[in-house]
From Swiss-Prot:
NCBIfam families: mutS1 (TIGR01070), PRK05399.1 (NF003810). Pfam families: MutS_I, MutS_II, MutS_III, MutS_IV, MutS_V. This protein is involved in the repair of mismatches in DNA. It is possible that it carries out the mismatch recognition step. GO terms for cellular component: cytosol. Belongs to the DNA mismatch repair MutS family. Keywords: ATP-binding, DNA damage, DNA repair, DNA-binding, Nucleotide-binding. The keyword ATP-binding applies. One of its GO terms (biological process) is mismatch repair. CDD domains: ABC_MutS1. GO terms for molecular function: ATP binding; ATP-dependent DNA damage sensor activity; damaged DNA binding; mismatched DNA binding. It comes from Streptococcus pneumoniae serotype 4 (strain ATCC BAA-334 / TIGR4). ATP binds at residues 602-609. This is DNA mismatch repair protein HexA. InterPro entries: DNA_mismatch_repair_MutS, DNA_mismatch_repair_MutS-lik_N, DNA_mismatch_repair_MutS/MSH, DNA_mismatch_repair_MutS_C, DNA_mismatch_repair_MutS_clamp, DNA_mismatch_repair_MutS_core, DNA_mismatch_repair_MutS_N, DNA_mismatch_repair_MutS_sf.
């Protein structure tokens, strides 16, 4: 970037840009934000705006692009959405009063994790994550700058850190330590995160907890430092940090949540077709955010679950009151977002009017709950603080039709401030006086077309055409000459104009000052507003669960202290809703206390996966406080759910289906307890038949002997059904089929015992494979069944015979075996093991 012979303004730009090399610098110049040099070239392409140049006639013209300040937010949103940072440099003084170059400073750096304003605000959280490390310990802190929520936890390995970041759907991570090359590869390339570094700490005794572990303390304080460094203002809406443990909630990793379609459909990436879509009858943005949080983190505390259930039951029992409650919630705006705008100093009159409207709805909501006369609701009612003094202040001060821009005037109600009313009176009377002067001078001069006009240059003036110049009174003085007319003034008109201009300026200044005082006063209520937002959100979520329970015919589940599962005529609620008018076939799931594993067999497409997901979905719904789809349901409280359902290859990181299967299986058997739920669907299909079967059997045996977790294990290895005779806690179940006159019907019904056929050719027929291909497959199948062999017969005689080593013969020792024998696998990370395997595979 050349800096020779730059103008003072461009030198100022260059100096500021040096401080923010990783951000687009939006440099305020009048009514535009300008970008220069590489920023201009890149922004023009990304934002699809014109690229021009400054000093076009110079040897090296400076590339330039700009966006209007009043519509800048939509352009900022595009840059942030694509993972860039944006630094905003504002004019810090009035250009008209500046001596030399206008003073400019960066007032905010907007990053993917610190977005507060947006041209498209939504109800999703935007979490900014910070991680720090001390030895093998990790501290992970995160916050949402809109809601002010602030959390921290401690984790024991980098895999758990990545899992938590995925669960939070964070886009930016603040790093308090230097990443290894491997860690950077995972975070930046595989997880596509924006990485920011922060070495300094921000010590805030109000927000931080001195009882935190050191690494948790540093992760929290560095996150605070980064937020203050980028936002450059007081953040009074941030809540004190809350420490949590992942084990305090029903644990599910990112893959499990994705396979169960908890908050979005895994195939479409959209809300529709997810549990969130099913349960969301919320009426407020806060309620929607809280519901999503409850789905992500179901409870393991029976007392808290039952507390939620009881409120849902109250709402079910009071239909008309619930209907009134729903209507009242529709008048509630996003209090958390409004509170953050107050804290950021960005509140406009519209925000305050929305806040007043919300506060005026609270007494009605509270009265509805009190009218139900249920002790269960007492804790909710206590959170509904209407803050009447704040609602009264805003309603008395802000005009109902106030403009959004605080400098446009007309913000403050008439009658709120006596001095402001006087200025407005002068303006109104001045307008009347001008009309009177116009009429008087028209009559006295005899100029019938005489009129008073106004523009910024000449102020108020009499407009006289050339044909009437001979009738101009002597006390008129010329202000401007035009081609066909002239403009005149009088001392009287000038005096009134002066009074009006003075009143207009004083009125505007006073109105702005009053609004600033009101905004400052509102800022004193931020904590109470946040508490109110939490209360309304909780009410909203619980009424939503009641509505869904009623419309989807859900029942209240019971929790036992044993490990028994007894779900009578259970349904997969999301699948049922998607099916619409079609008939959903319910299934009973029963696992006695001494049964830990159900081995599920049956044809593809028969409903094995849905049956397994049904159990997991029911458990999640039950533990977040929702009612569940069944005739009756008795469940244990699970501490974790592990799944391997689906076969999506992880192509980005180069991991095959089988590798993903093995990693997820390892995650389950490493972390599951006897109180966990494990779902494995067709484990082992990503490798050779014998390998897959051997692994599947050994995993089943390991879970049976060492873990004891409730497990549904669906398999196409029918040989595994014989395990029922040797594993006392395993039972076989299968998906029933009806075979009649050569036609096969899948009944989607789970019955005891193993399946006798796989019906793979029938599934292929449904998929539309050619008839001659299916006939050939049927012939091969008959030959295999007659021969009792696992290997298919050759299509034709080959000219050479390839000898295959027996699976059980001892082969010559391969050099790779020697290398494997040297590995100290107990002191290696999973990633190191995988890297070694990749290297060895390349040698084969």
């Amino acid at each position: 970037m050349a800096i020779e012979k730059l103008s003072p303004g461009m030198q100022q730009y260059v100096d500021i840009k040096k401080q923010y090399p990783d951000a687009f610098l939006l440099f305020r110049m009048g009514d535009f934000y300008e970008l220069f040099y590489e920023d201009a070239v890149n922004a023009a392409q990304i934002l699809e705006i014109s690229l021009t140049s400054r000093n076009k006639n110079a040897d090296n013209p400076i590339p330039m692009a700009g966006v209007p300040y009043h519509s800048a937010q939509q352009y900022i949103d595009v840059l942030i959405e694509q993972g860039y940072k944006v630094a905003i440099a504002e004019q810090m003084e009035d250009p008209k009063q500046a001596v030399g170059v206008v003073k400019r400073e960066v007032v905010q750096v907007i990053t993917p994790g610190t977005v507060v304003d947006s041209s498209k605000p939504d109800s999703q959280n935007n979490f900014l994550v910070s991680i720090d490390r001390e030895g093998n310990q990790f501290g992970l802190a995160y916050m949402d700058l809109v809601t002010g929520d602030f959390y921290v936890t401690g984790l024991l390995d980098f895999t758990l850190v990545c899992g938590e970041i995925r669960n939070l759907k964070a886009r930016e991570v603040v790093l308090g330590y230097d990443l290894s090359e491997e860690e950077e590869q995972i975070l930046s390339r595989q997880m596509n995160l924006v990485l920011s570094y922060e070495k300094e700490s921000f010590e805030d005794l109000h927000l931080l907890d001195l009882r935190l572990a050191t690494v948790e303390q540093t992760a929290s304080s560095k996150l605070l430092q980064y937020v203050h460094r980028t936002q450059m203002r007081e953040l009074n809406h941030l809540k004190p940090v809350i420490r949590y443990e992942i084990k305090d909630f029903l644990q599910m990793d990112y893959a499990t949540k994705a396979s169960l379609d908890l908050v979005e459909n895994a195939r479409s990436g959209k809300k529709q077709g997810s549990l969130f879509w099913l349960l969301d009858e919320t009426k407020t943005a806060m309620g929607m955010r809280l519901l999503r949080s409850w789905i992500h983190r179901p409870l393991i505390d029976k007392e808290r679950i039952v507390q939620r259930q009881e409120v849902v039951q109250v709402f079910l029992d009071h239909f008309f009151e619930r209907s009134d409650l729903t209507d009242s919630l529709k008048g509630v705006y996003d209090i958390e977002r409004l509170a953050s705008r107050v804290s950021f100093g960005k509140t406009n009159p519209k925000d305050l009017l929305q806040l007043a409207t919300t506060l005026s709805s609270v007494p009605r909501i509270r009265a509805i709950l009190e009218g139900m006369e249920q002790p269960t609701l007492a804790y909710l009612i206590a959170q509904l603080d209407a803050i009447p003094e704040l609602e009264s202040l805003i309603s008395a001060a802000i005009a109902p039709e106030a403009p959004h821009v605080i400098t446009d005037g007309g913000i403050i109600r008439t009658g709120f401030d006596e001095t402001l009313d006087k200025y407005r009176c002068v303006l109104r009377e001045g307008t009347s006086w001008i009309a009177e002067i116009e009429a008087k001078e028209r009559e006295n001069s005899g100029i019938s077309t005489l009129k008073i006009d106004y523009n910024k240059k000449d102020g108020y003036y009499f407009h006289v055409t050339n044909s009437q110049l001979g009738n101009v009174p002597a006390h008129f003085f010329r202000k401007a000459t035009l081609k066909n007319s002239e403009r005149f003034g009088t001392e009287e008109l000038a005096r009134i104009e002066g009074d009006m201009l003075e009143a207009r300026e004083k009125s505007a200044n006073l109105e702005y000052e009053i609004f600033m005082r009101i905004r400052e006063e509102v800022g004193k209520y931020i904590q109470r507003l946040q508490a109110l937002a939490q209360g309304i959100a909780t009410v909203d979520v619980l009424q939503s669960l009641a509505v869904v329970a009623e419309t989807q015919h859900l029942i209240r589940p019971e929790f036992g202290d044993d490990s028994q599962i007894d779900i009578r005529k259970g349904r997969h609620a999301v699948v049922e809703k998607v099916m619409g008018a079609q008939t959903y076939i319910p299934n009973t799931i029963q696992m006695a206390e001494d049964t830990s594993i159900q081995l599920v067999t049956g044809p593809n497409m028969s409903g094995k996966s849905t049956y397994m997901r049904q159990l997991a979905m029911t458990a999640v719904m039950a533990q977040l406080g929702s009612y569940v789809p069944a005739e009756s349901a008795h469940l244990p409280i699970f501490d974790a759910i592990f799944t391997r359902i689906g076969a999506a290859d992880d192509l980005v990181s180069g991991q095959s289906t089988f590798m993903v299967e093995m990693m997820e299986a390892n995650n389950a058997i490493s972390h599951a307890t006897k109180n966990s739920l494990i779902l494995f669907d067709e484990l082992g299909r990503g490798t050779a038949t014998y390998d897959g079967m051997a692994l599947a059997q050994s995993i089943i045996e390991y879970i049976h002997e060492h873990i004891g977790a409730k497990t549904l294990f669906a398999t196409h290895y029918h040989e595994l059904t014989s395990l029922e005779s040797s594993l006392q806690h395993l039972v076989n179940v299968h998906v029933a089929t009806l075979e009649q006159d050569g036609q096969v019907t899948f009944l989607h019904k789970i019955e005891p015992g193993p399946a006798d056929k796989s019906y793979g050719i029938h599934v292929a027929k449904i998929a539309g494979l050619p008839a001659d291909l299916l006939a050939r497959a049927d012939k091969i199948l008959t030959q295999l069944e007659n021969q009792g062999t696992e290997s298919p017969p050759p299509m034709r005689q080959t000219s050479a015979v390839t000898e295959q080593i027996s699976l059980f013969d001892r082969a010559e020792e391969h050099p790779i075996l020697a290398e494997l024998a040297k590995l100290d696998v107990y002191n290696m990370t999973p990633m190191q093991v995988m890297n070694v395997l990749v290297e060895l595979k390349q040698k084969l």
